[in-house]
């Protein structure tokens, strides 16, 4: 049996930093998963862990879900990729349009990064404007345009962006404070912003909730100034409710991005909106999007079965009940400490050293060293 340390020492020789994504890096080294089932991960040393990260988002229905596995096996018998349209991708698109608010047509892609990148291109093409507004701490994938004051792995590494991004790539990206409508309005009212892209709940800087009425004000500001609102539901979609944060907060985007959960553990994402908007995507329109694996039949099979399970009446009450049970327990244990705990169905975050977090600036003031210690101790206890 090889140890986690042995595998990490070898992986550093062949993989950048020993991992394929920086958020998987841990000190002194990560554990290497051998298999998973339900809520549990089992590493190569035989240690088991409860996966509260849900595979960083996709595994809402648990690892090795038997229904999804069966659906995938059935598709594998028919083929893995064709390079042609399939009837199943029509069914998948139709199902999404029936579930997701304000979506009539979609384009399937493979990752959340591809979805947000394509959504921004579409907004620019429609408005004939270049500028994009995002929010401090909001993470919309690993493409140049949005790696500005981002959350996720960028938040916990050395800098808030990345080397290798030309200044010209981000000169039209403006990042403003979340939950501050005046900061947003002062930029958008200039009339030259193509799109506002927003995580309705900023999940990659913890779990920063929008204040009451804030998202409606964001929508109003966008509409009044001819700016499209991109609702990035890659994380919140199908998590906080079947209709995502749009349904929860009663605010619809013009373009909606989806990912993570919709693939049931397989690479699958999408962006969508009203027909008037989506008809601008190639080949009908002049905004280009393409991909060899777009609508991959194996991913679509997993996605369709995932939607079947999510639409069952017991699914979301169960998710909310589990979230409440976990967060109630955390609150009981930390109520006498200086902490802030925020949650929505299927997601939560505990901040140390602060009592309120309403934006990225507040999140950065939290005691991240204490959080690292907390995380390390949880790993020792199999969490």
Give the location of each predicted region.
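Conserved N-terminal phosphate-binding loop of PLP-dependent enzymes in the Aspartate aminotransferase
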Residues: 1-383
């Amino acid at each position: 049996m090889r140890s986690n340390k042995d595998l990490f020492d070898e992986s550093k020789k062949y993989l950048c930093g020993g991992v394929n994504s920086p958020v998987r890096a841990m000190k002194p080294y990560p554990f290497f998963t051998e298999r998973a089932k339900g809520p549990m991960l089992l590493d190569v040393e035989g240690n088991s862990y409860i996966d509260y990260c849900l595979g960083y988002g996709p595994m809402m229905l648990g690892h090795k879900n038997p229904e999804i596995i069966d659906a995938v096996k059935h598709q594998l018998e028919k083929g893995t990729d064709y390079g042609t349209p399939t009837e199943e991708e029509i069914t998948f698109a139709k199902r999404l349009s029936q579930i997701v608010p304000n979506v009539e047509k979609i384009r399937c892609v493979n990752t959340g990064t591809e979805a947000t990148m394509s959504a921004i291109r579409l907004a620019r093409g429609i408005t004939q404007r270049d500028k994009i507004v995002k929010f401090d701490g909001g993470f919309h994938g690993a493409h140049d345009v949005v790696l500005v004051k981002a959350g996720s792995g960028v938040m916990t590494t050395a800098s808030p962006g990345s080397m290798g991004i030309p200044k010209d790539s981000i000169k039209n990206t403006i990042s403003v404070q979340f939950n501050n409508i005046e900061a947003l309005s002062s930029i958008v009212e200039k009339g030259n912003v193509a799109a506002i892209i927003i995580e309705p709940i900023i999940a990659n800087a913890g779990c920063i909730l929008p204040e009451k009425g804030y998202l409606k004000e964001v929508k109003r500001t966008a509409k009044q100034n001819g700016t499209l609102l991109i609702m990035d539901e890659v994380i919140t979609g199908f998590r906080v409710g079947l209709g995502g944060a749009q349904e929860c907060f009663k605010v619809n985007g013009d373009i909606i991005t989806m990912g993570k959960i919709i693939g049931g553990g397989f690479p699958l994402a999408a962006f969508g909106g009203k027909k008037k908007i989506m008809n601008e995507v190639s080949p009908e329109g002049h905004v280009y999007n393409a991909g060899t694996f777009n609508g991959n039949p194996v991913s679509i099979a997993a996605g369709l079965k995932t939607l079947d399970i999510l639409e069952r009446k017991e699914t979301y009450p169960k998710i909310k009940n589990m979230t409440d049970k976990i967060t109630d327990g955390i609150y009981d244990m930390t109520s006498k400490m200086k902490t802030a705990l925020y949650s929505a169905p299927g997601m939560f975050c505990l901040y140390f050293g602060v009592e309120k977090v309403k934006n990225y600036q507040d999140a950065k003031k939290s005691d991240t060293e204490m959080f690292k210690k907390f995380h390390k101790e949880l790993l020792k206890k199999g969490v």
